[in-house]
Amino acid sequence: MPKARFSCKVSAVTARGGDFHKNIFGFGSSNVPARLEQNGKFLTFAALYIRSMKIKEVAAALERFAPLPLQEDYDNAGLQVGLTETEASGALLCLDVTEETVREAVRRGCNVLVAHHPLLFRGLKCVSAATEVERCVREAILHGITIYAAHTNLDNAPGGVNHRIAEKIGLEEVKFLQPFTRSGFEGGSGVIGVLPKPEAPLEFLYRVAEIFGVEYLMHNEGPKDRQVQRVALCGGSGDFLLGEAVRQGADVFLTGEMGYHHYFGHASDLWLGVLGHYQSERFTLSLMRDVLAQALPELPVFLATQPTNPIRYMHLPEIAARNQKEQQ
């Protein structure tokens, strides 16, 4: 019999299907293996033992995959708020900690909230209700929720965020763009790889936009006389790697954010594709889920349902048409 994905101890229980999941364990049947439901209307658990785990085991699993020394100097990955010796009831994964994601963790009965972006970059001088960060900290403490962040250490880890992006767009022969070793751990910033076959630049950028759900992809005017095959990329804010991408002969460089002046001077070098910070990291949650599922299959893991992108897009086609006419 496969292990069910929740942490509890049961000696012998019989209950009706949906009510059992909801009332005894606090979540729906999607995390209960099919074999436990094959008797139909009734579920019987006989002498079933499922071990409990502490929150520190969740943190340890993430850090085995993405060691904290791999994070950048400015970063604050790791424990943000809460206790680690408490038993883990479940983990909610999100890109950003907001008041809504804290509330969702409470609703789902999860006392672990794992974010990609740290809630705390700088120290707090007080915890009140003055700012959203303070309110998130307060609500997490009140509800016994531990907040943990896996940020640039997850970006820089082998098989991490940038490798997941490369996988999604079909790159082969992927390696770190700027490899390094920190405290004995190997990692790197960005990745570079090759497409199975060359693609027309704008067709490639359109394909990437579709994969990542990008409404407005920004790009430069790159070399029009050649197709793209060698691709460098960095999720999030990656313009610091643009020079390295040029040096390594990339045909295109993809990232989430890029400063205005970086768009200049590369018309003969390579194409630039800027997806948006949030959009470039959209597959980070599935990566974290896979890491935890492999290391801790008993842990209930949920992906946050509320989008946390703070940027809104106002589409004004009449202004776009006017601008295009003025440029002619």
Residue positions per predicted region:
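Hydrophobic structural segments
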Residues: 44-328
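Low-complexity, intrinsically disordered Ser/Thr/Pro- and acidic-rich segments
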Residues: 25-27, 34-36
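Intrinsic low-complexity/disordered segments
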Residues: 18-19, 35, 45-46
